[in-house]
Amino acid sequence: MKFETDILVIGAGPVGLFTVFEAGLLGLKCTLIDNLDKVGGQCSELYPEKPIYDIPGVPSQTAQEHVDALIEQIKPFEYDLHLSQRVESIQPVTTSDNITTWVVQTNEGIECTTKNIFIAAGAGSFEPRRPPNIEDPDKFLGNGVNYSVKSKNLYKDKNLFIFGGGDSALDWTVELAKTAKSINLIHRRDQFRGAQHTEAQMRELVESGHVNLLTPFQIEEILGNDRVTGVTL
């Protein structure tokens, strides 16, 4: 498939969706390309039920609600959407009147010519960060091992081990502590990389006995047969 567009947006997460809105106000047509099979980026793929508190004018909304609002916002404007497509090459082409355009090709055979490319891919296509010293953690995938939280209800009244020291680990520790039977937060360092406010909330939960904090530890082994039954640190 070959076509031309005013603006090609690589990444259909919140920034990519808002780019369609801003371009629409200028009367420009956008084409969105994303490696995932849905719009919303990490908000939809990794933590659709995660509360977001830092959107101006919106006290609180979930990540999926934020994506849904952006989709609603761009409905008046014309745009094309190509999902499950990974950009593999971007080549400059100089026309006869000395104007540079770009030819973008995807792994599924799309070839798009455009004068403008907006790269809104965030950290890139999502790849799980697996424990480096576990031979095959994915053998328990969906049976005790998960790399994202699609539904908070799946973890209600469960004994949870959360590994990590960034925003996602801290955010989900605070959020799931409301409904989980127990939560153990494990990090290989004593220092955390997440927002200070969320870290303070986590430490309050530790002091009140709602979260068990284990640092500095790494996961050495996942125990179980068909399902996870425990871990070795």
Regions found by a protein language model. Name each.
Residues 1-10, 25-26, 38, 81-158:
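FAD-binding core/adjacent interface of flavoenzyme oxidoreductases
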Residues 2-37, 141-195:
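Rossmann-like dinucleotide/flavin-binding elements
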Residues 20-22, 44-45, 129-133, 173-175, ...:
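Short amphipathic alpha-helical segments
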Residues 22-51, 98, 123:
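Flavin (FAD/FMN) cofactor-binding and adjacent substrate-gating region
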Residues 37-61, 195-201:
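Conserved N-terminal glycine-rich FAD pyrophosphate-binding loop of Rossmann-like flavoproteins
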Residues 52, 67, 74, 127, ...:
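A general structural signal for well-ordered alpha-helical segments in protein cores
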Residues 55-82:
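Conserved FAD-binding subdomain of flavin-dependent enzymes
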Residues 74-106, 111-114, 178-233:
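A Rossmann-like FAD-binding core segment of flavoenzymes
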